[in-house]
Every structure is written in C-alpha cells, then in structure tokens.
Amino acid sequence: MIYFIFNKIKVFYRFFKIDTLLLVFIMLLSGLGLLILYSSSGGSFDLVYRQLIHLGLATSVMLVVAQIPPLLLMRSAPILMLLGIILLILVLLFGSYGGGAQRWLNLGFIKFQPSEMMKIIVPIAIASILSERTLPPRALPVIISLVGIAIVVLLIAKQPDLGTALLIGASGIYVLFFSGFRIRLVKNPWLNLGLIAGILVSLLYAAWNYLLISYQKNRILTLFNPESDPLGSGYHILQSKIAIGSGGLTGKGITNGSQSRLDFVPEQSTDFIFSVLAEEMGFIGFILLLSIYTLIIYRCFNLSLRCEDNFSRLLGASLTFVLFTYIFVNMGMVSGLLPVVGVPLPLISYGGSSLMTLMASFGIIMSIHKHKSPRYLQ
C-alpha cells in the first residue's frame, strides 16, 4: 500500500514538476486554517467542507498555472493589463453591490471580483515593462509603470475599496523596488530626500481631503483611540484585542474561546480569524503560524532568486513580498496596529476568490522555478 502511494506521488511529481517542499508548506498551513475555521464556526463542518472545495479548485489552478512558461506571461502582459482595466471600468458601470461597495461583476453564469485578478496582473505587467532592458530601469519604463499602477489604483478606490487598491498599488511598487529603481529628482541627496518627502506629504494631504470618504477616515482615526467609540467604529479592534490577549501562552483550546464562541469577535471566519487562533492556541499557536509563513516566504524568495532572467526574478520576488504584506496587514489590523481594511489572512481565512488568487501566485512562482533553464527564455 505504501509502495503504491509512493509511486502515485512520484508519477504526480514527474507530470507536474512542481516544488514539493513549497507544496508541503502550503498544505500544512491549509490544514491549520481548516482547524481554526472549524473552531470559528462553532464546531460546525459546513464552512470546512466549503473551504475544502475552494482549496481543491485553487490547488487545481495552481497546478495549471505552474505549467505556463514565464515567457508566455511576459508576452501576454499588455493584453492582461488592458483586459483588467476594461473589467474594472465595467464594474463601475454595471457592477453589483456587496458589503457597501460596487466590486462584483455578474456575467450570469459566474460572479467574480476583477480587483482580485489585478493582484497578479499588475506585478506581471510591471515586471514585463521593466525587464525589457537592463536594470536598473530608465525613466520612461518607470513612468509608464507608475501611470499603469495609478490607473488601476484609482479605478479600484472608486468602488470604493481603498484597502485592496493600496495593496495592489504596493504590488506594482515592489516590482519597481526590486528592479533597483532610485528616485533622483536633483543631484544633492539631502535636497532629493526633502523633495520626495514633500511630494509624499502632498499626496497624503490630497488623499485625505479628496479621496478618502468619511467611513475610511473614521477607521484611521479609530486606530489611535478605539475606546472613544467602543460600540461603533472601535468595536472590531477592541474585541479582537481582548481575544488575542486572553489566549495567554497555550490558549483556551480549540472551540473553547469565549470571545469567538459568544460571537464578540466580528468576521471571525474571514478577516479576524487570527483573533480566534490567538485566543484558542495562544502564543504557541501564533509561533506555529508565523513559522510556517516564514518557511513559505523563504522558499518563495529562494525559488525566485534562482531564476536567470530579470522578468522571473522581479515577478517572483514581488509576489512573495505581496504575500508578506497581506500577512503583516492582517495581523496588524486585528492587533490594533493598523486600520481595519478587510484583508484576509492567507490560507487561513475563509474565502474562494482570494484563495484562487493566492494559489495562482504560488503557481507562478513554481512556474518560474520550473522554467528557469535558459532554453525557456528565448
């Protein structure tokens, strides 16, 4: 029996040629996510079964994407970016509402969120633009990249979904960062730093006064003093912090968390699922979660840096840093260190669209490692 299973695994590996170590880490984290999801739903298997279906579909997407050569992604980048922008415009014109925002596009046979696609499309497009010539890039490709990022960010912010807009914008900026791009407005380094700081302050001022709407401003202000509105805008943060703090070293045990079982923790199966983990598994559970995340991030960076072409290195490194950003933002959000922006915890939170996007990202990283041989880059 063991020999039969081993042979099947060997055939599977030879056919797909994926990175086994990364897959093992992903499955470990997914298993932990299912356990916490079971607990957050009050010991019900309903959400667990549905998440298992999502995981199966998302894993299939990862395996398919892992077979796509990076060269095909690079050549398809302009079409993908144009298609993504068109879909974002269609969302603003004909999109359906959900959760107070116009984010979904309903085609009758399928309902999806185009902004989820842009989490992958933007890094692919920017990496394609910047990798056409030697690095660090010259001014023209950088300007084109910034314009493309700005268009996508503004269209998503208009839905409104500022959290997703900023994170997608960051995914494009990460590609610029890894390309070695440096902002040099003037020769004097101190004057250059002052000008950059002035531009950033001006952008923040403009965003606060002309881009952010009232509830988004309230979320930011609540961050500094959640006790000022404990039953309103500060409720999420306060209940989450109580749950995290009450977990102690070893936690209260699976399905034994008082904050989660009594429904004090909001969105405990999605955005605030980390609060459930911290309350029921304590500091040890947090270290376990952080350790698996660290292994995944290290492995993804390791696979990306082994690549022999600029496009693959830029794309792999930026997608890995996007994963880190989502982890950091979610944990910071539920801990009261960052505003509540509705970001799921990767491979732990319940959800289908975000999971598909994440697994597709893993598929891309596996693909650039699989096709790192020079013969794929011609």
Feature roles, as predicted:
Residues 23-31, 35-233, 275-335, 360, ...:
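Hydrophobic alpha-helical transmembrane segments of multi-pass inner membrane proteins, especially
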Residues 1-10, 329-378:
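A juxtamembrane structural motif centered on a specific transmembrane helix
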Residues 7-26:
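N-terminal membrane topogenic signal
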Residues 161-166, 252-257, 268-270, 287, ...:
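Transmembrane helix boundary and interhelical junction motifs in multipass membrane proteins
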Residues 244, 248-284, 311:
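Long extracytoplasmic/lumenal interhelical loops at the membrane interface
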